[in-house]
Amino acid sequence: GIGGAGMSAIATVLAAMGHHVSGSDLKASAGLERLRALGIDVTVGHRTENVGAVDVVAVSTAVPSTNPELVAARDRGINVVGRAQILAAIAARRRTIAVAGTHGKTTTSSMVAMVLRAAGVDPSFIVGGDVNEIGGGAAWTAGEWFVVEADESDGTFLELPAEVAIVTSVEADHLDHYGSAAAIAEAFARFLHSAPCTIVCADDAVAARLGAEAGAVTYGTSPDADYRIDALVVERAGARFRVVHDGAVIAEVSLPIPGAHNARNATAAVVTAVELGADLKPVVEALARFGGVARRFQFRGEAGGVTVVDDYAHNPGKLRAVLDAAGHGGWRRVVCVFQPHLYSRTAAQGVDLGAALARADVVVVTDVYGARESPKPGVTGMIVAAAAIDARPWRRLAYLPHRGDIVPYLHDVLRPGDLCLTLGAGDITSLADDLIPMLASRTGR
């Protein structure tokens, strides 16, 4: 799975550290070409012969135990490790800043890395998305700090040796692994208690409670936050705000990306810089030019008066944040195409997903993108669609389980001045490749 965002970032860092790295993925991609350019031996397709004379085989969570390369490695007695074990080994070589949360961690970890880089801290980093400023999600430097996105999905984020632990949010996600909201909250509590320095968003109820128990430094719009977001203005093209600490304004921030959630993410980066003793002037300057992360409110194009934006949002908290940002843009309408991700998440959170989508003016729900999971009887995108209708019965909604029906439907629905959002962690991101040419070819709209 070397082509995925997380594994490709790890491969990049391992190669920069001087290791010989090879890997495979199911299909060709720009990410694979980028790895090849770094001298990494990349193969398309999973085959036994790909496992050469190696010491360690690292595997992503998306790879099944029946994968031929994985089977071959185990048969030969090669050490097989997961993503978290590799990350922990890398983190052990540096002072580590780990960013966790059920939403916001990719953008926050990217911002932390970029502002510390600007402030001369020169951190190494691995994040779960391509940072637009550098065209990738990883770097290995001579600096003493390492910024890492800590994935909570399977509990392995607890293996990271964090000196600074940041929690952006905690909601009842990944219930296929944790089983309950209480269990995931307990995992985050352990994460916070394992680090000597903890930074937590005060605007998230569960995170704030866990932070109080851990003695964390807090940030957010809450009046109780140690670092308070003040005078927040959210617009189509960005956000402006001040950071207040101990009654004094310590930073005036102008972001080129929209959303109150991104103001929170940026404030987490400011707080981290303060905790590390960095100069805030270059930090604020870095945030002013922060170009975002791939698939996080990413502008894909404009045609026929319609703006198309893609986002990775796939749980209720992420959907609410993205649609809140869209709501401040002054668009004629917000038209949302949502692809549910994982059967387990759809079964557990379908009602909440639908309620979050009710913020849009027009909603299209596709069938579930199963990823690593097999279909479950009775679990389809219709669960989400029905919940969205229940939440706002007068809103226009279509359930279109077949991908080929979506663009023709949008041909008849979209109007100049609309924002069209494609949302989900699956292959819905490629819809823009078909949608934008269609919009460009229309006449009379």
Feature-to-residue mapping (PLM):
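Residue-level recognition of phosphate/Mg2+-coordinating polar/acidic sites
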Residues: 106
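Switch II (G3) loop of P-loop NTPases
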Residues: 145-153, 308-314
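Short beta-strand-centered segment that lines the nucleotide-binding/catalytic pocket of NTP-utilizing
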Residues: 25, 121-133
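Acidic, Mg2+-coordinating active-site environments of NTP-dependent enzymes
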Residues: 32-34, 50-59, 63-82, 87-88, ...
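Short secondary-structure boundary segments
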Residues: 61, 127-128, 169, 202, ...
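Conserved motor-coupling elements within RecA-like helicase/translocase cores
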Residues: 139-142
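ATP-dependent carboxylate-amine ligase
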Residues: 1-40, 53, 57, 65, ...
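Hydrophobic anchor at the beta1->P-loop junction of P-loop NTPases
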Residues: 97-99
